[in-house]
């Protein structure tokens, strides 16, 4: 399973570890992903999503119905 947020599209980024001597080695920055389930009252069911903490805040702000409508419009199967 890929490390991608279903709502925001956040994914793994790459960069460098930089030591005190300024040596650089490659590293990955992983998104803060969680499998969360949200109650959708209009459909009377739970929906499981793999979301970042940023996406959880977005869902709290806009509502799960609006977020699901956006996902379905973009072709995501939910």
From Swiss-Prot:
Gene: rpmB
Annotated organism of origin: Xylella fastidiosa (strain Temecula1 / ATCC 700964)
UniProt GO MF annotations: structural constituent of ribosome
InterPro entries assigned to the protein according to its UniProt record, in alphabetical order: Ribosomal_bL28 (IPR026569), Ribosomal_bL28/bL31-like_sf (IPR034704), Ribosomal_bL28_bact-type (IPR001383), Ribosomal_bL28_sf (IPR037147)
SUPFAM superfamilies hit by this protein: L28p-like (SSF143800)
Superkingdom in the source lineage: Bacteria
Coiled coil residues, start to end: none
Protein name (database record): Large ribosomal subunit protein bL28
Keywords assigned by UniProt, alphabetized: Ribonucleoprotein, Ribosomal protein
Family: Belongs to the bacterial ribosomal protein bL28 family.
GO biological process: translation
A Pfam family reported for this protein in Swiss-Prot or TrEMBL: Ribosomal_L28
GO cellular component, one term: cytosolic large ribosomal subunit
């Amino acid at each position: 399973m890929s490390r991608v947020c279903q709502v925001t599209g956040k994914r793994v980024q790459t960069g460098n570890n930089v030591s005190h001597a300024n040596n650089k080695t490659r590293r990955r920055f992983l998104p803060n992903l969680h499998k969360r389930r949200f109650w959708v009252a209009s459909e009377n069911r739970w929906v499981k999503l793999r979301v970042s903490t940023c996406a959880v805040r977005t869902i709290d702000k806009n509502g799960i119905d609006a977020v699901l409508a956006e996902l379905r419009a973009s072709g995501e199967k939910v």
